[in-house]
Amino acid sequence: LGDSHHIDEGTHAYIRYNRVRVPRDAMLGQPGEGFKVAQARLGGGRVHHAMRTVGKCQRALDMMVERANSRRTQGKLLAEHQFVQGMIADSYIELEQYRLLVLKTAWAIDEVEAGRSPPVAPRTLIAMCKVQMAKVYHDIIQRAIHLHGSLGVTLELPLADWWGGVASLALADAPTEVHKIQVAKSLLKRGTIAPGLFPGEHIPTRMENLG
């Protein structure tokens, strides 16, 4: 690849086991339960990813606001262009929505640690954080890059480097699609079944039952 290319700190290593034997007294847990142990830690790791995403998106939004208040095009500040105002508003709204989801998820985990909720309670929230993570990150970083023009795609700003992490966020700790399935299954499991031929909100049936 040449001297101009390098492997950065975000690269994951390949590990290959060849006839590895583990002494019985060195085993953690029971045979076949390694995935369960890993899953116990992945939940917190996913929330950690989410928190870092909130922080980077906040930095990107701050950069957008600074750029809009400083850069002039066509005789006026970027901040005076309504399209730019819309980009900033959309980014702030999406960030605050995601921030609240992450905070609620962290609160749910604390409730489990305090013994006030069952261990499975935060799972759906964690999956929701993972699903939205890459989308919110993608949309806000993309707007920030566009607002900075050609400078946004250079390594003179952190935006291009952040942009390169969008795909990995959607894949790390299981792809987005897997977490969507988990969210849907959770809702379907708790859902109801129509009491008869028509849906539960069927107005004529409800009026008839009111008598």
Locations of regions flagged by a protein language model:
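Generic, well-ordered alpha-helical scaffold segments in large soluble proteins
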Residues: 41, 60-67, 104, 108, ...
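Alpha-helical transition-metal enzyme core signature, strongest for iron centers
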Residues: 54, 58-61, 88-102, 130-140, ...
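C-terminal helix-coil-helix/basic helical segment that borders enzyme active sites and/or dimer interfaces
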Residues: 65, 69-76, 96-132, 145-152
